[in-house]
Amino acid sequence: MNEEQRKAGTINILAERDRKAEKDYSKYFEQVYQPPSLKEAKKRGKQEVQYNRDFHIDEKYKGMGKGRTFLIKTYGCQMNAHDTEVMAGILNALGYSATSDINEADVILINTCAIRENAENKVFSEIGNLKHLKKERPDCLIGVCGCMSQEESVVNKILKSYQNVDMVFGTHNIHHLPEILEEAYLSKAMVVEVWSKEGDIIENLPKVRDGHIKAWVNIMYGCDKFCTYCIVPFTRGKERSRRPEDIIDEVRELAREGYQEITLLGQNVNSYGKDIEGLDYELGDLLEDISKIDIPRVRFTTSHPWDFTDRMIEVIAKGGNIVPHIHLPVQSGNNQVLKIMGRKYTRESYLDLVSRIKEAIPNVALTTDIIVGYPNETEEQFEETLSLYDDVQFEHAYTYLYSQRDGTPAAKMKDNVPLEVKKERLQRLNKKVGIYSQQAMSQYEGKIVTVLCEGSSKKDENVLAGYTDKNKLVNFKGPRESIGKLVDVKIDEAKQYSLNGTFIQEHQRSMVTQ
């Protein structure tokens, strides 16, 4: 999709701040804004994705931020963290300086998450808390961006109740931040620019990475799976893959800069490459090419079981810098619930995939996501989730109560599992999660593990902390020079969700040759 096509899907809203709240805000939309629609989204056909490698900031915007500061608050997934790095890079290029003091920031951006109702509530609370700041410092700009901005109901709520917000923009037009800022400075009205359809892939965007040890590397955008509970296909758009050469160049540059670990990101990384016409190249091929680059650790997230290929298993099994940790969300252990969720696999096919992974990679650490209390979930169906957990023996799981999201097919289902029942099931599941986590941790007692030291422990400045290749948190006392390096640590104590150990030495590793 080129820029002219993109403009056809652009939404611009100018809402007067002092206008009284009204129930219908459609009059503020210069073009019709379509709310998330499964029917319409599924109609999105294959469109040629344009790759823009010539991103630059117009000279007229440079210096816009001279003498001004910015702060970005980030909610949600790793993709949002990556988007924040890009926005920080653009703001730096405009002359802004970062600050950690929200009371001093001249530009405040709230990068939002729409995956669960609780996340949205936190964001609205945050925006509300900024009302007093806007009164005290009317010249500061407050912006709301990220996935929540792609929802019409959210935009309407901001228009109605949060007139302290100066600008709202979505996930597809971050590279237009200079133009959005300029409009916000010049206008006395709220500026909302939300692209209802995904855009081109923009390369060479500036980034301010969070630290110099680990880095996010986006390999694709969007999702075409349409799980019935998930808003992501609507807020992030259709699947679009970056070109392999662009990804590999970025990873090589990170290796030259001394980064010790990268994580390949996508809403569904297993679909990587499928949308690139004339290219027979999948995630397994990308992993193999990246394994030849001298960077100690390579991770990827998130995987959908339906797309997990034998080629991927083969490459991970070779070892090297591809870590033996696979996050494989199952969501439920019951076939009927999985079908209603639109997950496209069965309990049996999932367990078969796990069996193939474990056979090829005996030392693999498997983790997962599980939703409890999906509409119509019975006690017997939930118990099948518990039994699947026993079968797989995941080393950790992220567990959630079902959260209804407006605009998804599941929102039309009756949320008929009582909250008390949901909480009781979650408690039982988490008890099992703790048991298997303790079991996984206990095997490390007395052993020496390699840890990527990331800094001081959150609980004790005198203790260092880092993660193993299987993503186990390790706390240990050692020299400050260990920060940013791979070190060997002897494990003295295995706790349920972390390990305590003693520093041995800096880890000696062999170079990867291309």
Curated annotation (Swiss-Prot):
SUPFAM superfamilies: Radical SAM enzymes. Residues 209-439 form the Radical SAM core domain. PROSITE patterns: MTTASE_N, MTTASE_RADICAL, RADICAL_SAM, TRAM. Its cofactor is [4Fe-4S] cluster. GO terms for cellular component: cytosol. Pfam families: Radical_SAM (PF04055), TRAM (PF01938), UPF0004 (PF00919). Residues 68-186 form the MTTase N-terminal domain. CDD domains: Radical_SAM. The keyword Iron applies. Binds 2 [4Fe-4S] clusters. One cluster is coordinated with 3 cysteines and an exchangeable S-adenosyl-L-methionine. [4Fe-4S] cluster 2 binds at residues 223, 227, 230. Its main location: cytoplasm. Monomer. Catalyzes the methylthiolation of N6-(dimethylallyl)adenosine (i(6)A), leading to the formation of 2-methylthio-N6-(dimethylallyl)adenosine (ms(2)i(6)A) at position 37 in tRNAs that read codons beginning with uridine. Belongs to the methylthiotransferase family. MiaB subfamily. This is tRNA-2-methylthio-N(6)-dimethylallyladenosine synthase. It comes from Staphylococcus epidermidis (strain ATCC 35984 / DSM 28319 / BCRC 17069 / CCUG 31568 / BM 3577 / RP62A).
